[in-house]
Amino acid sequence: MSERPEHGSHTLRIYSKPGCHLCEIMIEELLPLIRGRLDLEVVDIESRPDWMQDYGTRIPVLEFNAETVCEAKLDVTAIQRIIAQHTSS
């Protein structure tokens, strides 16, 4: 796979592209869960041909610390686990 952009230790990254309905749904469901706890970086896969090749048929792909958390549908349990392990409340 191609090189991933740098991100902070409390940042989720979603690989997406404009007009991706599943991506929009995942972001909409994710934001209330992470607000004030984790950051979200939206990566447009159309900005690089290698990302289009790697993620084009898999989006949305959600990653944390360069590990895939879920694809296509939000895994709420996985997000709750990440929040519990990586944030202080």
Predicted regions and their residues:
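Local sequence-structure signature of Cys/Sec-based thiol-disulfide redox active-site neighborhoods
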Residues: 2-32
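Structural micro-motif
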Residues: 56-62
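Generic recognition of short, well-ordered alpha-helical segments
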Residues: 25-28, 53-54, 74
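Short, well-ordered coil/turn elements that cap or connect secondary structure elements
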Residues: 35-37, 56
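Non-catalytic, surface beta->alpha helical segment in thiol-disulfide oxidoreductase systems
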Residues: 65-89
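A structural signal for the main folded, soluble domain(s) of proteins
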Residues: 19-24, 38, 69, 73
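Thiol-based oxidoreductase modules, predominantly thioredoxin-like and allied folds used
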Residues: 38-49
